[in-house]
Amino acid sequence: MARELRMLLLWGRRLRAPALAAACGGKPVLCPWRPPAQSWGPPRSLASSFHVGRPFSSQAAEDQAEAGPLHSVISSLEAVQGSATKHEFQAETKKLLDIVARSLYSEKEVFIRELISNASDALEKLRHKLVSEGQALPDMEIHLQTDADRGTITIQDTGVGMSREELVSNLGTIARSGSKAFLDALQNQAEAGSKIIGQFGVGFYSAFMVADRVEVYSRSVDAGSLGYRWLSDGSGVFEVAEASGVRTGTKIIIHLKADSREFASEARVRDVVTKYSNFVSFPLYLNGRRMNTLQAIWMMDPKDVGEGQHEEFYRYVAQAHDRPRYTLHYRTDAPLSIRSIFYVPDAKPSMFDVSRELGSSVSLYSRKVLIQTKATNILPTWLRFVRGVVDSEDIPLNLSRELLQESALIRKLQGVLQQRLIKFFTDQSKKDAEKYARFFEDYGLFVREGIVTTAEQEVKEDIAKLLRYESSALPAGQLTSLSDYASRMQAGTRNIYYLCAPNRHLAEHSPYYEAMKRKNTEVLFCYEQFDELTLLHLREFDKKKLISVETDIVVDHYKEEKFEDGAPAGDCLSEKETEDLMAWMRNALGSRITDVKVTLRLDTHPAMITVLEMGAARHFLRMRQLAKTQEERAQLLQPTLEINPRHVLIKKLSQLRDSEPDLAQLLVDQIYENAMITAGLIDDPRPMVGRLNQLLVKALERH
C-alpha cells in the first residue's frame, strides 16, 4: 500500500490526461515479454505502468519498472552501397505533400499515430503471409527511438518490408502505401483484409509536417531480397539506393525541423503513443520499454472478460475511482461492424456532468487505433453520461482520420447504439427493479432530456420506456413505467393520465386528483421539475395520449349530473344561490378571471382554477418569467374559477357577500389565490400575507 501511495503521489498529476490517453500494461500476444530495465527517467503516467499479470495495477507497474533489461531492435548498421537513383514524385503526390504539410492534420502529433498504423499493417501482412505458408512467426514488433541530441525520431517494424520497386511505387505515388494493393489481392479473404488500417495511402506523408528530411530503410521478407534506403526532403524529389545492414522490415528516420524538436523527447512521444496507439495489436516499444501492454478488451468475446477486468478498464477510460454501475459489452456485425463497451458510473452525476457543455465521454477507435477521444456524433447528447469505447471498421473517415464525415452511415451507427443502450436499460429494469430505480433517480434528467431534444416520435417513445413514476394505483415509493401503466388500462381506454406535483402528499390532496378519483382512473404522479415538459413533448405513448388531469377537467364533456350527489339539500347551495354567488364573484375578482363556474367534482376543496393546457402555460410562465401582475397572468392564462357549492367556505361566502361585504372580498380574494397556488400558477405567495393577517384579525374580533 505504501508503494502504491508513493506512485500516486509521484505520478498522480498525470491522471489529468484525456480519457483513453494513458498507457497501460499487458502481455504480448505474438512474442515473449521482455521486461524493461529499471529507469529513473522522466515521470511516467500511472496508467502507462499497468501490467497484464495484474491488470491496471499500480503495484504491478512498479514491479515492472524495477525488472529486466531494455529491449530494442533499432541499430545504426545500415550503410548505402553504390550510387542512388533519383525519382520525382507524381504530380498528385507533390500536391498531397503540400496539403499534408499545411492543412490536412489539425495536430502535428498525429504523424506518430499514422506511422505506427502503417507499421501495424506491415506486421499484419507478414503474419498473414507466414500463416498461409505454414511458417513459424518471428518476433513481430514495433519500435520507436528518440534522440534529442540529433533531433530525430525513429520508428522500425519487423514486418513484411519492401523491395526497391515497392519503395518507388508505394512511397512515390499517392494512395499506394501498400495496403490498397494488398486488399485488392485479398478481396476474397475478409479476415485478413479487415485488419488493414491504412486505407488512404497518405499516412506516411504526415511525417513531412515535422521533418526536414525522411530516411526509410527497408528489406522485403521475400527470400534473397536486398536492403534499400529511400530518402527525401519532401521537395518533390526522392532517391533510392541499395544499403547493407538492413533488417527485414521497415525503419523510418525522421530528421525533425527546428520547430518540431519536441518529438525528439521521450516524454512527449510517450504521451502521443499512449493517447492514440495504446491498443495496437503488436508489441510496441519506446526506447526499449514496452508501451502497449493493455488489452483492447472491447475486441474480446464478452464471456472472456471478467468483472474485475471491466472494473479496472472502466477506471481507465472514465478516469474515475468508483465502480461501474452498469456494464454493456456489445458486439455485432450487422447492420454494422461494432465492437464496444459502455459503462454507467456508480457515482451520482455532478452539476458539471449534467451540463450539455461536457460533451461525449465515449472514445472512437478504428481497428484499435484512436480516432477521437470525445466522439460527439457516435451517441446522442442525452447519453453523455455513458463512458466507454466504440470500435467500428465501417466508419467513414476523412483523410486525416480525425474528423467524422456527416453521413447516413454515422447516423445509422448512432441509431443502432442508442437503441441497444435503451434495450439494455430496459432489460436491467426488469432484472433488478430496485437497482434501476436508483439509476433513474440519479440519471433520470438525462432520459428526460432525450425525450425533449429528440425529433422523431418513434425514438421519443423508445426513450420513454425508461421513465419511471409513482402511481395512484400503487403504494408510495413503488415505481411504474408507461408500458406497465398501459398494460393495466381497461379495454377501450385511450388516455394515460398524469399529475405533476412536488410530492405524493400534495398530489393526493390536489383538487385535480380529487376530481379524478370519482372516475376510479389511475394517475401517474410526477415529482420532478422537468417531468411536465417531458410529457408535453412526448404527447403520446403506444398510441395512447398523455393527458394531464388538469387538462382533462377542461376538455371532458361529460355532464355534472353524472356524479351522484348524495349530500342533503341543506349541505349545498341552491341553484339560485349558486348563480347569484357566481355573478358576485365575477364582479369581485374582475379581470383576474375569465369566468366562474360550479363543479361537483370536488369534495374537500372549495375551488380550483382550470386553464386550457395548464402544463404548457405553467412552463411558459416559468421559463419566460412573464405576466408578473395578476392581471397580466389572467390575460395570458384566461383562467376559470370552479367553485364547490357544498364546501363550507363557499356557503359562508354566499352569506357574507350581503352581511359583511368587506370580509367577503377578503375571503374571495384568498380563495382565488389559494386556487392559483394549488395550480402552480403563482410562485411567490408572500404578497397574500397581509390579507391573511386581516382575515385572522377579523376571526379574532368575534371572540
Curated annotation (Swiss-Prot):
Binding site for ATP: 118, 157, 170, 204, 401
UniProtKB keywords: Acetylation, ATP-binding, Chaperone, Membrane, Mitochondrion, Mitochondrion inner membrane, Nucleotide-binding, Phosphoprotein, Transit peptide
Phosphothreonine: residues bearing it: 173, 493
BP terms from Gene Ontology: negative regulation of cellular respiration; protein folding
Database matches in CDD domains: HATPase_Hsp90-like
One Pfam family of this chain: HATPase_c_3
Modification N6-acetyllysine, positions: 423, 430, 465
Gene Ontology cellular component annotations, sorted alphabetically: mitochondrial inner membrane; mitochondrial matrix
Record: transit peptide: 1-56
Modified residues (Phosphoserine): 169
InterPro entries per UniProt: HATPase_C_sf (IPR036890), HSP90_C (IPR037196), Hsp90_fam (IPR001404), Hsp90_N (IPR020575), Ribosomal_Su5_D2-typ_SF (IPR020568)
Keyword hit for Transcription regulation: no
Zinc found in the keyword field: no
Main location: mitochondrion
Compartments where found: Mitochondrion; Mitochondrion inner membrane; Mitochondrion matrix
Quaternary structure note: Binds to the intracellular domain of tumor necrosis factor type 1 receptor. Binds to RB1. Interacts with SRC. Interacts with SDHA.
Homology family: Belongs to the heat shock protein 90 family.
Name recorded for this polypeptide: Heat shock protein 75 kDa, mitochondrial
Protein species of origin: Bos taurus
Record lineage: Eukaryota, Metazoa, Chordata, Craniata, Vertebrata
Protein encoded by which gene: TRAP1
